[in-house]
């Protein structure tokens, strides 16, 4: 519910209308009701959903809402060891919290977010993007990728400003 509260806070201030889709008797999204979302700018769902149900209707959801409506999926990263990857059922944007991947809160933070998207949204992403590559010795390497010079030299033009400790934790989680 925390993510939904954040969505409401941002959308209310921007004058964006939010429609809530109904669930069926099993706690899954009502696919008949999902037709109302066609033509919206985006649909946000969580997997597992906010009441803990693994919703098997999401693969049909993208077909119902259409390609012009972004499907945004909030995930619990540990669950992806068992559940299908959201990209496989048409998610355009995937978000989650990286803390369960080895950033113990007992260490005093910091924590990091997970944010993935399809190619059309890639250059619109804020923050730092960790990419996997191969170094000069042929070994797997992780690096910050697709960051513009403004991120580092022009604070007023940067899309985000994060500090080194968060970057180190994000790199650790990516590995």
Regions found by a protein language model. Give the residues of each.
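Conserved active-site segment immediately N-terminal to the catalytic lysine
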Residues: 87-103
């Amino acid at each position: 519910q925390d993510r939904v509260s954040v969505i409401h806070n941002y959308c209310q201030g921007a004058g964006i209308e939010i429609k809530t889709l109904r669930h069926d008797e099993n706690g899954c999204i009502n696919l008949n009701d999902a037709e109302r979302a066609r033509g919206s700018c985006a649909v946000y769902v969580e997997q597992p959903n906010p009441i803990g149900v693994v919703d098997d209707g999401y693969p049909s959801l993208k077909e119902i809402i259409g390609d012009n409506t972004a499907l945004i999926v909030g995930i619990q990263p540990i669950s992806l060891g068992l559940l299908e990857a959201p990209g496989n059922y048409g998610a355009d944007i995937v978000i989650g919290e990286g803390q369960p991947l080895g950033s113990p809160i007992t260490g005093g933070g910091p924590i990091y977010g997970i944010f993935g998207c399809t190619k059309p949204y890639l250059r619109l992403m804020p923050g730092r993007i960790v990419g996997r590559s191969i170094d000069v010795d042929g070994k797997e390497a992780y690096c910050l990728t697709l960051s513009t010079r403004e991120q580092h030299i022009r604070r007023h033009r940067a899309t985000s400003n994060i500090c080194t400790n968060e970057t180190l934790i994000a790199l650790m989680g990516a590995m």
